[in-house]
């Protein structure tokens, strides 16, 4: 920790004393009638059909609107409020549907037999077929978002609470919209305020994350945990008694405000009624009934203990509040990000960068694309971590036995994470083209990496080839041996074993930690329940269904794991090449002057098409799609086979050949979606078909060249001219970049929606 010099303190003081500019841009509704008002070229209106494409491409590219960093940053800040408003409206709609149309209370009363339903479909021309029997006399559309399980964890027990939340969310949406307008038109922050990094870290880490987590811990302690205790007791068949009344049904539950009464709450958690005296006298053991470290899963609900979750959020909130105060803001004490960065020098032998991290602070503070790139990479990785924790440590009651919800949440968080990581590559490329000044980065680590880019990319290329040939070669070998009737020569758990010994070692290390006192800090050591059951734990059943069990790994897992590794490395190769060669390459030394996206590099330099940083993102999206498809296929089949007991444990012997994947996974498990017509899941059959069409539509844009379409349009325009019905807006074929963008968008949408229908019909169809 260091004391900042007086002039630095003064500078910070000025920023925080006068952080905003009043009335920088009066509200002008007339602009809304003029599409493309932010561009002199587009605001003139369309002459060709290219206008509509440029309108879409540049509407959110704030850099090109004004070229002013302060103005662009204000727009981003204002857009955040708009984004939050949309989220609140979306949440309000979910709450409203839950309150008015769903079977939430029916599910809450019998969560192991009743299925979650969103609404009942009106009978217009036979649509009532979609209303499946979900139990408890409710016919409607089954959902798999996990929203019911989440509401139960929050402590919501009736429709009026959901309606109150719906109204509250709409009010919050209005406040957010007002905030966006206010902070752009009436009181817009100055550029210095946005670039006051330490204050931003203080506000985000201590304020938003720390206090937010602490506030949520308060809700979990006072509402969530007591409600969970009462509901769990009902579901276990041994209801609790409050004030002499047995809480036997949902109707008997106390209202949330009643749970804040010490006299009532003391009958559930005596520690909650003991007052704050124990806190200030450091007798924190008195709170151990509602702030627990039980570990493992609640045997009634198959989910983490609500009191453990409350304890987690309390601890995390305190850590974040302390962590948010590590940085130097008003008082001259604390760490400076610039000083921390510049104190790190490159290794003189392994990574010679004489100027170390000099210039990096300014680049990260001033480049919005660089910031977004790092944030997307971190958040994407976090989303992928979440997807794995959702099944290994199920947080919400009864979610672990709702198999479609488990699979849906895994798939959702994998797609989101992967898209964010590709976005990180995209914005890193934009940052290199638009925000990177080579003169300010001589002999620092960024410059050093750019100088070493040929070695980095060629080595990564070699790794990809090695992984690809070897991992795919194992499958080719197995398919060949099976076709020749030589099972003894196959790679399998029964013949030539390729056991994932490192993964098994990681699993056993987790299990071997049980009983050690070093990690737990207690004489009796780390309890068995402190580990996820997937690490050599025990099977947990809820309502006759497997909630979680140990996940054994074998040859089939090692083989598909190396396919995952291959695809991840190729995706990274493409993205990294797009970033490192965004400004220049041997083929096109002046890429930086051509911009982030350009189709071809003009006449005279043949073979220079499709080399822009944008084109690398385009290609990476296909590899990302294939990569995540195999990941979710692996998860779906592995869980159905080895955990949920739906396919008779066929994964280990069928997943070791390509034919096995095609026959026993794709073909065998698609029977539900292909035979869904006439059933409640028939919409997934239609979605499966329609999404295939969307996917096939994309190939029209990806396989054909721009010239083909332009010639087609010209002949159609000629025919119109002959009939004197020529349009005033001249038809133009999409540019190469536009065509590729339309192609990849439909490819991803079609592919993802096809998988969506396949998964849902499979698990809903099995009941």
From Swiss-Prot:
Region (Disordered): which ranges?
1-22
| The protein, known as | Photosystem I P700 chlorophyll a apoprotein A1
Assembly and partners?
Answer: The PsaA/B heterodimer binds the P700 divinyl chlorophyll special pair and subsequent electron acceptors. PSI consists of a core antenna complex that captures photons, and an electron transfer chain that converts photonic excitation into a charge separation. The cyanobacterial PSI reaction center is composed of one copy each of PsaA,B,C,D,E,F,I,J,K,L,M and X, and forms trimeric complexes.
Compartments in which it is found: Cellular thylakoid membrane
- Which reactions does this protein catalyse? reduced [plastocyanin] + hnu + oxidized [2Fe-2S]-[ferredoxin] = oxidized [plastocyanin] + reduced [2Fe-2S]-[ferredoxin]
Per UniProt, [4Fe-4S] cluster binds at: 600, 609
Q: Which residues cross the membrane?
A: 76-99, 162-185, 201-225, 309-327, 368-391, 407-433, 455-477, 558-576, 616-637, 681-703, 741-761
For the keyword ATP-binding, the answer is no
Residues that bind divinylchlorophyll a', according to the entry? 692
Record family assignment: Belongs to the PsaA/PsaB family.
In short, the EC number is: 1.97.1.12
Task: Detail which positions bind phylloquinone.
Answer: 709
The record's listing under Pfam families reads: PsaA_PsaB
Top-rank taxon of the source lineage equals Bacteria
Q: Which membrane topology term applies here?
A: Multi-pass membrane protein
Q: What UniProt keywords are attached to this protein's entry?
A: 4Fe-4S, Chlorophyll, Chromophore, Electron transport, Iron, Iron-sulfur, Magnesium, Membrane, Metal-binding, Oxidoreductase, Photosynthesis, Photosystem I, Thylakoid, Transmembrane, Transmembrane helix, Transport
- Would you indicate the residue range of the signal peptide? none
- What does the protein in this record do? PsaA and PsaB bind P700, the primary electron donor of photosystem I (PSI), as well as the electron acceptors A0, A1 and FX. PSI is a plastocyanin/cytochrome c6-ferredoxin oxidoreductase, converting photonic excitation into a charge separation, which transfers an electron from the donor P700 chlorophyll pair to the spectroscopically characterized acceptors A0, A1, FX, FA and FB in turn. Oxidized P700 is reduced on the lumenal side of the thylakoid membrane by plastocyanin or cytochrome c6.
Q: What InterPro entries does the record point to? A: PSI_PsaA, PSI_PsaA/B, PSI_PsaA/B_CS, PSI_PsaA/B_sf
Report the NCBIfam families cross-referenced here.
Answer: psaA
Annotated residues for binding of divinyl chlorophyll a: 700, 708
What is the top EC class of this enzyme, as a single word? Answer: oxidoreductase
